[in-house]
Amino acid sequence: MSAQGDCEFLVKRARELVPGDLWAAKAWLITARSLYPADFNIQYEMYTIERNAERTASAGRLLYDMFVNFPDQPAVWREISVITAALRNDSQDKQTQFLRGLFETLPGRVQCEMLLKATEQCFNTLERAEMLLLLLRRFPETVVQHGVGLGETLLEAENIEDQESPVNCFRKLFVCDVLPLIINNPDVRLPASLLYKYLNKAAEFYINYVTRSTQTESQYQGSQDSSDLMSPSKRSSQKYIIDGLTEKSSQITDPWERLFKILSVVGMRCEWQMDKGRRSFGDILHRMKDLCRYISNFDSDAHAKYKNQVVYSTMLVFFKNAFQYVSNIQPSLFQGPNAPNQAPLILLEDVTNVYGDTDIDRNKHIHKKRKLAEGREKTMSSDDEDPSGKARSRHIAVNKADLANSIEVLESFKLARESWELLCSLESLDKEFTRICLSWKTETWLWLRIFLTDMIIYQGQYKKAISSLHHLAALQGSHSPQQITGQGSLENQRALIQLATCHFALGEYRQTCEKVLDLMCYILLPIQEGGKVQEEQPKVKSKFRKGSDLKLWPCTSRAIMPYCLHLLLACFKLRAFTDNRDDTALGHVIVLLQHEWPRGENLFLKAINKICQQGNFQYENFFNYVTNIDMLEEFAYLRTQEGGKIHLELLPNQGMLIKHHTVTRGITKGVKEDFRLAMERQVSRCGENLMVVLHRFCINEKILLLQTLS
């Protein structure tokens, strides 16, 4: 029998003995190896027996022998491939743990060599990168030789694969796994240009990861408490799987913390003017402002260095705080489909002073049939209100019930705003920041456009804000899945109400009215009369000039409809109380003053005073929409001798009736009787839901309302 035949016989005999007598099988193989030490099959069979019996130490020794003596055998590499896969695997099953333990028994030098050779066997870029990553983590000394090369390979693979989003498997491995190993190793020498390139890639990845919207999360699983979702760092614990990676590998804890750590390390390597210890965002921003004051005094190299410090430090403070603001005022952008529904908040001009400046006792009602001299005091006109609100510092009011952490959120808004202003303050900073934003395609970030729109409104640049809102509408159109759901109509509401508030601030009252009336189509009825809501929302006395206050309003029908009515009233009262007579505008004002009655009592008295001065008044929609008992009694009083016998044309076609007939005693008596009956019918309607009445007024009289402001 030949030597090969002998080996095969011995291996076969050992296999037959394994089920019944393991020790006998091992004895046969030990004998066989002593006779034929160069035969691979004998050693491999010995290894197989030890591996199947899960004897870690002996299996490890045999694997080591095979790796040294038979490095070209495919079976050895198949085995090594299984072991390295177990090292990369997140699983905790018994077999995987055994294979990891087996690898640990190998000498460090062999582990390193094995991983290097295993890497050479990989033709898949991702698998090869993960294998090299194993090597770099276990043997930090290899980072100098292989770290930068691996990083560049991953970035090159990202370009070759033409990844749509920076949040992809290649970028994740580079930013989260490879980059920290490179920049934290003092033996790896990197030019500043490469460090800035890597910082840029890391910032783009982390910001996109944290701000990924629900539309892009096709593999999003589960949801979280709304309180947790307020925190961008906590939000990262949602189950989100990056294509090509495992669930565990896709999770990133404290992404902002990681990003600012990279910023700090890069800053030290680039010899920035760094502060020792941890600094708040406010401190960082203050430091950058100081640096900007004397940045122009440096030579070109130092200027470039500190320019990069200011741009990257300020930019990261900006994006962090802008996201913090938007994720709190509109959390639905970043939550999963099963998350609790929280109404978004919208930044609007505060028009709660629409009723005038005179303090009103809200519990007081109009004295029935008061005498003209006593009851009709002149109220202060608000014609002189300055709606532009271009004060440098403006107060933003918000109810605690709508936003529990309002102090922190408004501080984030302030920091983001100041960061943006700093980045735009010098041409060199602005140019670099713009370049980065273009490369990141930030113009497609819906959440960022929401922040920028609010910031522009805050700055009082209303024409620019209108352009920004049109940009926002285009972005929302590109996020088509949301348009199918309620989110689409919600975004439309946000755009319409902010457009309305901007047009109002510009004095463009017809456009204001148009947007408000379009918005009324989205209002869900019924809404309870909100007369007492304002009592729960005391007006904050601000040190800023009149008309400069802003407020964060919930985007709900209950909150938005009262705001719309305020805007309409503000538009029409300017026309109603000018020297030129406009009964239609005055009639619209009277209808709108029913809302939150008696807050508008003084303005109503001003309207009555104007009617008395005119001696007559025509408004044929009166009985369609005026149901307030105090107003009805006042108008009934106007027709009496004591009230001044004011000529009122409040019935439809009443004017035509008088014009086309000879005014006889009988016809006049008939008109009086019609008026009395109409008043009686109207009194019976006083219990109607006023918000339903006013909503009907806005919908049915849209053409008339717009014509009045033309």
UniProtKB/Swiss-Prot annotation:
Annotated compartments: Nucleus
One Pfam match: INT10
Region (Disordered) location: 366-393
GO BP annotations listed: RNA polymerase II transcription initiation surveillance; snRNA processing
Record GO cellular component, one term: integrator complex
Keywords tagged on the record: Nucleus
Quaternary structure, from the entry: Component of the Integrator complex, composed of core subunits INTS1, INTS2, INTS3, INTS4, INTS5, INTS6, INTS7, INTS8, INTS9/RC74, INTS10, INTS11/CPSF3L, INTS12, INTS13, INTS14 and INTS15. The core complex associates with protein phosphatase 2A subunits PPP2CA and PPP2R1A, to form the Integrator-PP2A (INTAC) complex. INTS10 is part of the tail subcomplex, composed of INTS10, INTS13, INTS14 and INTS15.
Function per UniProt: Component of the integrator complex, a multiprotein complex that terminates RNA polymerase II (Pol II) transcription in the promoter-proximal region of genes.
Family the UniProt entry places it in: Belongs to the Integrator subunit 10 family.
Protein name: Integrator complex subunit 10
